[in-house]
From Swiss-Prot:
The lineage of its organism: Eukaryota, Metazoa, Chordata, Craniata, Vertebrata. The keyword RNA-binding does not apply. The gene is ywhab-a. The modification N-acetylmethionine is found at residue 1. This is 14-3-3 protein beta/alpha-A. It is found in: Cytoplasm. Coiled coil: none annotated. It holds the Pfam family 14-3-3. It comes from Xenopus laevis.
């Protein structure tokens, strides 16, 4: 199958909501080694976001059930084994994406926005790994996530408009990383507020093409800020995930 056929198959899979097939097609496109177009880049991102998102959601549900079955050894063991199965699937998906990023996507990225997009993606997938990791493994994945986000953040600040949807999406996810993974609400709020304020100050630079995306992410930044700064930021904050 040539590149155009693989891309067509990915689009067909997306319409059928068969995201594993979509991811397989876009993985094959990436492994051809050429720099991806914006459309191909977005297809790859959507495919893997759905594939990993399903496992992250399952993992949270099963982990919750596992905790509630304390005192019932048989049921708890079943829940634990099932959680470990989902965990392995999630880790394999993340490692697949990180391998594509390290071997093809980041090295081949030439425009700053592509570099930021892929480094943000790298930060995201190390973050997903850190959600299910423990001990030394958790420390490593957290450090790798922060490093990728930070590198992307520095490029975005120097090369992109504050209203650019990729820059805003990065600020959104990096702030979620600070809040949920590093348990640093002050840093999370500071980062989200700066990104929001800088974008508001330059709203006139918004082009028609990205207006909808940018304003949606700005709304998510504001929603997170409202939640994080409210008094009852306990349990409900765990459900906040401003993934873009």
């Amino acid at each position: 199958m040539d590149k155009s056929e693989l891309v067509q198959k990915a689009k067909l899979s997306e319409q059928a909501e068969r995201y594993d097939d979509m991811a397989a097609s876009m993985k094959a496109v990436t492994e051809l080694g050429a720099e991806l177009s914006n459309e191909e880049r977005n297809l790859l991102s959507v495919a893997y976001k759905n594939v990993v998102g399903a496992r992250r959601s399952s993992w949270r549900v099963i982990s919750s059930i596992e905790q509630k079955t304390e005192g019932n050894d048989k049921r708890q063991q079943m829940a634990r084994e099932y959680r470990e199965k989902v965990e392995t699937e999630l880790q394999d998906i993340c490692k697949d994406v990180l391998d594509l990023l390290d071997r093809f996507l980041v090295p081949n990225a030439t425009p700053p926005e592509s570099k930021v997009f892929y480094l943000k993606m790298k930060g995201d997938y190390y973050r997903y790994l850190s959600e299910v990791a423990s001990g030394d493994s958790k420390q490593e994945t957290v450090a790798s996530s922060q490093q990728a986000y930070q590198e992307a953040f520095e490029i975005s600040k120097s090369e992109m408009q504050p209203t650019h949807p990729i820059r805003l999406g990065l600020a959104l996810n990096f702030s979620v990383f600070y809040y949920e993974i590093l348990n640093s609400p002050e840093k999370a709020c500071s980062l989200a507020k700066s990104a929001f304020d800088e974008a508001i100050a330059e709203l006139d630079t918004l082009n028609e093409e990205s207006y909808k995306d940018s304003t949606l992410i700005m709304q998510l930044l504001r929603d997170n800020l409202t939640l994080w700064t409210s008094e009852n930021q306990g349990e409900e904050a765990d459900n906040v995930e401003g993934d873009n």
